[in-house]
């Protein structure tokens, strides 16, 4: 294992943060898998999973079982990790710019597309190499000018040439669930089943500008551009990415993290990144994928106290009671009902809400939303 420390641009005088990455196997060896945790810095289950995954990787490396390359970043956001306000962690948004740490990643296909599309030929693997080389050159020539930009640039530089990228997050209160691109799902389905995901949300493009989509969408967009231009050059999905939501913010325990780390390790063996004894058989799925465009965000019609009737993991029908929002001044209770059939896969932790605030999310099977599919 090799540890590499990446100093970020200093935000102010006398203050500089460092991102640390841990490298296993041989650089450049295929397949390459990149795993990071806690890009939203207050989302800590993934950080503990990375802590438990590391000794498994060290043991595999010592036994000569790592056949590819693995990069592990257990603390993907030292900027957000240092942010607190009134004793509360503030790791989702950069307090200086107001930007979400997992948004505003670039459209790399738009950047490299005009030049790289002309270079693609009849050999699929050669085309993958050409695209990765173009991405490498673009990132090498990019010069970030802020601390936040340098964090994004460093993460992309570590991950851009990976075959698979796992971005470990969590929700407020939730079951374990997945976000991934439709093109990536076949490759990542065994991982979801090893982890016993209870909701799987698929999208072709959520238009969110998230870290994982930045890395997978470049391949989808370039392939679409080839088709639009009538170019028959083959371009496989060179990078499959997923955001794994490891339950809720308070689900930080050794028992859960050890099980999740072992599940990820089993998937690494299943994909051939790690050799040695055969991986356990992929478990049967606990759910079927549903479209992200079919996910309902249940909102509060008025301000008040929140009393949930539905628990995370409940299978709801249209009209089922999700929560009551109580106004103790007006002595009114507003019943908030499910608008779609599906699993209530996430809900808020707070028990007071403002009018229009998000209460919960239900994974419906029928698409009904368009445009930007992820919130702030």
Model-derived features: positions:
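Structured catalytic-domain cores with a bias toward divalent-metal coordination
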Residues: 1-376
